[in-house]
From Swiss-Prot:
The record marks 203 as: Mediates proton transfer from the protein to the inner aqueous phase. It is a multi-pass membrane protein. It comes from Salmonella schwarzengrund (strain CVM19633). GO terms for cellular component: plasma membrane. Keywords: Antiport, Cell inner membrane, Cell membrane, Chloride, Ion transport, Membrane, Transmembrane, Transmembrane helix, Transport. A motif (Selectivity filter part_1) lies at residues 106-110. The lineage of its organism: Bacteria, Pseudomonadati, Pseudomonadota, Gammaproteobacteria, Enterobacterales. This is H(+)/Cl(-) exchange transporter ClcA. It holds the Pfam family Voltage_CLC.
Length: 473
């Protein structure tokens, strides 16, 4: 009996020693091994949650569409039901954001940028459930939003959660795991690991602290999230447009013209986003009831729009291959483009939990395809393929709006598996970025972050002014 007790005690002592060794390793924040191990954990978690989010959104969409199919033969039921279902789903998202986690509204990417500079708080315990469930509601309603913004914010918050769980206290670990989660989130959303890395390095370059450990951690997290994504979804590109022909050298000037067009469109689009945000803010004034009802009305309209013109609703991933294949006329492409600009502004600027990457990619595809089809008529001697201009346009609007040309180029090439178009992509995206900068356009996410910080400072100043005199001394 004594032998059994001594054996049990010895086993317990060994377990406790192992736990203590692991705990001490994790608390040595500057140990590269500890941070890289945590980066792998963050990347794996982000990949799993990203896949779960994608499946959950698809499930909600299928349930909604299935309910509409059941009454498809009864128009007097179909139209009201389409409005009501989408309105209710959207209202869930708006309510959760406004009531429990206002920082979960919109794409969430500016929040991560602010957190990397220690200017915005990361409250993962409330952002994670609100962003996940709220995103299920708004994206499931058929609103013109993407899932990449939510997965980037979810990934960043998972990074902070892991940091808190393992009690890693250094500023370097806090910064590195937050950036790792954000990069892994973009990779998990688009199956684009290299774009996830470039997004952190390029788009978040003012906030990201370059050093050997942080770069290795970002690489590690992105690798793990990509592996998880491919285990569940396979290795095929998420946008199937087929293998397009190369762009002959004598046609490259046309891609520069396309870049110039997007260089003009990008700043205008950004300005419209900000103006629409101001319009919604004046309308609801922060009042939750008005905000939720407004969101329900927008969601319901998207539900109706999905019946009238399915291509004008939703994130746009289903629209991109159809448009790139040249199945629409130039006039119809421009009509859908204008319609989706309006719906993108309404959905994104209203503060719904959802991203703007996917809608921008769809807009770029529409305008790029229209340009390619028109160029094919004007220059028949070139034997142009409109799909190549669609691919170039996908990255160009993002480059002009977000001011991240490298990320736009690599993201589109990874998503479509058309790496042979890298030269026209570079020409188009570089032209769009340079002209947008020349015209005075500001990067969209940086501008949104600046407005958020200004609002935060104003609220803090008002709070300090209203506080009793004794509290300020």
């Amino acid at each position: 009996m004594k032998t059994d007790n001594s054996t049990f005690l010895a086993q317990q002592i060994v377990r406790l020693r192992r736990r203590d060794q692991i705990r001490r390793l994790m608390q040595r924040d500057k140990t590269p091994l500890a941070i890289l191990f945590m980066a792998a954990v963050v990347g794996t978690l982000t990949g799993l949650v990203g896949v779960a989010f994608e499946k959950a959104v698809s499930w909600v969409q299928n349930m909604r569409i299935g309910a509409l199919v059941q009454v498809a033969d009864h128009a007097f039921l179909l139209w009201p039901l389409a409005f009501i279902l989408s309105a209710l789903l959207a209202m869930v998202g708006y309510f959760l954001v406004r009531k429990f986690a206002p920082e979960a509204g919109g794409s969430g990417i500016p929040e991560i940028e602010g957190a990397l500079e220690e200017l915005r708080p990361v409250r993962w315990w409330r952002v994670l459930p609100v962003k996940f469930i709220g995103g299920m509601g708004t994206l499931g309603a058929g609103m013109v939003l993407g899932r990449e913004g939510p997965t980037v914010q979810i990934g960043g918050n998972l990074g902070r959660m892991v940091l808190d769980v393992f009690r890693m206290r250094s500023a370097e670990a806090r910064h590195t795991l937050l950036a790792t989660g954000a990069a892994a989130g973009l990779s998990a959303a688009f199956n684009a690991p290299l774009a996830g890395i470039l997004f952190i390095i390029e788009e978040m370059r003012p906030q990201f602290r370059y050093n050997l450990i942080s770069i290795k951690a970002v690489f590690t997290g992105v690798i793990m999230s990509s592996i998880v994504f491919r285990i569940f979804n396979g290795e095929a590109p998420i946008i199937e447009v087929g293998k397009l022909s190369d762009a002959p050298v004598n046609t490259l000037w046309l891609y520069l013209i396309l870049g110039i067009i997007f260089g003009c469109v990008g700043p205008v689009f950004n300005s419209l986003v900000l103006r629409t945000q101001d319009m919604f803010q004046r309308f609801h004034g922060g009042e939750i009831k008005k905000w939720v009802l407004m969101g329900g009305a927008i969601g319901g309209l998207c539900g109706i729009l999905g019946l009238i013109e399915p291509e004008a609703a939703g994130g746009g991933f289903n629209l991109i291959p159809i448009a790139a294949a040249g199945n629409f006329s130039v006039g119809l492409l421009l009509f859908i483009f204008i319609t989706r600009v309006v719906t993108t502004l309404l959905c994104f600027s209203s503060g719904a939990p959802g991203g703007i990457f996917a809608p921008m990619l769809a807009l770029g595809t529409l305008l790029g395809t229209a340009f390619g089809m028109a160029a094919a008529v004007l220059f028949p001697q070139y034997h142009l393929e409109a799909g190549t201009f669609a691919i170039a346009g996908m990255g160009a609007l993002m480059a002009a709006s977000v001011r991240a040309p490298l990320t736009g180029i690599v993201l589109v090439l990874e998503m479509t598996d058309n790496y042979q178009l890298i030269l026209p992509m570079i020409i188009t995206c570089l032209g769009a970025t340079l002209l947008a900068q020349f015209l005075g356009g500001k990067p969209l996410y940086s501008t949104i972050l600046a407005r958020t910080l200004a609002k935060q400072d104003a609220e803090q100043a008002a709070k300090n002014q209203n506080a009793p005199a004794g509290e300020n001394t």
